[in-house]
Amino acid sequence: MCYDIKASYEAQLKRASQKGDLAAVEEILDNLIPFTDLPIHHACGFCHPVLLIYTNESPDFPTVATWGLVPHWVKDEEQQKKIWNNTLNARGETIFEKPSFRQAAKNNRCIIYIDGFYEHHHFNKKTYPFFIQRKDKNPIALAGLWSEWINPETNGRMNTFSIVTTEGNFLMAKIHNNPKIKGPRMPLILSDEQEDEWLNPT
């Protein structure tokens, strides 16, 4: 699974910075960053930190969003608080089946750029955190799903997201050995070539 991450300004601004639009980057720093919890050296999803995501509707300019997807059909704050601890991650194998993710999997995809993520190794009844990052330390692009939820009690709007996970590879199988989970998991990491394809599947 993926519940703990590190996210710096530089990582979160990767896609906008690549476009070379300095005015846009400045606008993000001035008008969006203050509404996030960045920079994050160790964020736990269960604390529902606020990050930047790049959505299929705005692929080059980020959106402020809270970790823990809240589907559009959630009726009130009580239901919202119950569901978003269960939607921090979305199993890639079932995103088109689960009611919480079906709509987003078809229409609302996003990318989250991070410096790395933490996974815990279990040994002798203790857990040991491992920090996973790229060898070149460049930002990691994670596949995500997002949703806009309108609070019917206040009419307030909130963007939320979930990180898509997949079966752990050989390396992650050695690290992510939680006995309570069936098989190792890891976030779905996108290559540069896969980013646009993820946002706009055919």
Segments predicted by a language model, with ranges:
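Short linear sequence motif anchored by a di-proline
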Residues: 1-202
